């Protein structure tokens, strides 16, 4: 009898482990993911993506982005690029875009926003991408590219939101978010 109980416990433990392993691999395979082709997470942005101001040598070309496995119920996306190292640690907003249709799963480098998408305001108060331009000689800055899957229709938000205003507007509408970090220095 004791042998049978021990064998049953071992089978139950093995079965539980298999279920857990299946659940973890299923979750990992279905996680909302963001990548930038050619730039691994933690990698360095090419100089073309840098700002054109202050002799940074760039052309303000947005990085290419791809995402997959948005959660069920996603109606639109929002993307921000934020440099937490900029402005002496207070941070710098480089890009705000929202109202991106749920059918969109990528943005080409330097490409036009998808039809209907809106540009928010960057650190300069412009509705545009502003490429990185950290002070010369500083350690490379980190640029957090974050995408939010939203339950909002693409046309739900007004044009010209700042990053803070966008965060306030989507606070109760984020289904999931994911990010990658890129670096740039000069």
Question: What is each model feature region?
Answer:
Residues 27-186:
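N-terminus-centered regions that define maturation/targeting leaders and the start
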Residues 2-13:
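Bacterial N-terminal signal peptides that target proteins for export
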């Amino acid at each position: 009898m004791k042998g049978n109980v021990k064998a049953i416990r071992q089978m139950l433990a093995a079965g539980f482990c298999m279920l857990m392993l299946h659940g973890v691999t299923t979750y990992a395979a279905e996680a909302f993911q963001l990548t930038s082709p050619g730039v691994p997470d933690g990698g360095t942005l090419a100089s073309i993506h840098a700002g054109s101001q202050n002799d940074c040598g760039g052309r303000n070309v947005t990085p290419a982005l791809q995402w997959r496995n948005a959660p069920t119920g996603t109606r639109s996306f929002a993307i921000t690029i934020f440099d937490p190292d900029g402005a002496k640690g207070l941070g710098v907003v480089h890009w705000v875009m929202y109202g991106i249709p749920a059918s969109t799963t990528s943005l080409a480098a330097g490409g036009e926003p998808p039809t209907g998408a809106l540009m928010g305001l960057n650190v300069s108060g412009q509705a545009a991408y502003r490429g990185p331009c950290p002070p010369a000689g500083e350690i490379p800055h980190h640029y957090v590219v974050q995408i939010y899957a939203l339950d909002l229709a693409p046309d739900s938000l007004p044009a010209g939101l700042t990053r803070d205003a966008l965060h306030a507007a989507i606070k109760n509408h984020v289904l999931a978010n994911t990010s990658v970090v890129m670096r740039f220095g000069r």
